[in-house]
Swiss-Prot record:
HAMAP family: Ribosome_mat_RimM. It comes from the Bacteria. GO terms for cellular component: cytoplasm; ribosome. InterPro entries: PRC_barrel-like_sf, PRC_RimM, RimM, RimM_N, RimM_N_sf, Transl_B-barrel_sf. This is Ribosome maturation factor RimM. GO terms for molecular function: ribosome binding. It is found in: Cytoplasm. The gene is rimM. The keyword Oxidoreductase does not apply.
Length: 182
């Protein structure tokens, strides 16, 4: 099915998607892509999965659209039983495979866990998720336990220059112009 590569494992793993249920009897699987354009997941190779705590490299043999789904065929996965063993496995690549971004652009993975503070120094909390709304991305911030406003979660639009004043990935902080009461 796949070969284990002790020497070649992702140094900085990034999850790009997940394998879904098997499709048919010849080892095809549904795939759920987390990339902005769903088909972009196929641009990043090799893929790694984790089985029983060990990294394994899997090779994409083929992929195609089926109704609303993307389905994949992996080398060495030739029947439904082998495919079922991979259901729910995350598709991982090394972050070095991702393209470099322009100044002011960030990967969501880099913003996760950043502390968010207002320009006045009020600690809003930590980024726990991101949402795509169509017009702009939104930071989902888990507020600190002793938040002065009693807020558990904040949604702050990622509008560079307007709301987002400074992103410092080295110190893992994001400075925002935002009313802590919201």
């Amino acid at each position: 099915m796949s070969k284990q590569l002790a020497a070649q494992v992702p140094a900085e793993p990034v999850v790009l998607g997940k394998m879904g249920s098997s499709y048919g009897i010849r080892g095809w699987l549904r795939v759920f892509s987390s990339t902005e354009d769903a088909e972009s997941i196929f641009d990043y190779q090799p893929w790694f999965i984790q089985k029983a705590g060990q990294w394994q490299q899997v090779q994409l043999e083929s992929w195609k659209h089926h109704n609303q789904d993307l389905i994949i065929k992996l080398k060495g996965v030739d029947d439904r039983d082998a495919a079922n063993l991979l259901t729910n496995c995350e598709i991982v690549v090394d972050s070095s495979q991702l393209p470099a971004l322009e100044e002011g652009d960030y990967y969501w993975k880099d913003l996760m866990g950043c502390q968010v503070v207002t320009a006045e120094g009020y600690d809003l909390g930590k980024v726990i998720d991101m949402m795509e709304t169509g017009s702009n991305d939104v930071l989902v911030i888990k507020a600190n336990l002793k938040d002065a406003f009693g807020i558990k979660e904040r949604l702050v639009p990622f509008l560079d220059g307007q709301v987002i004043k400074k992103v410092d990935l080295a110190t893992r902080t994001i400075e925002v112009d935002w009313d802590p009461g919201f």
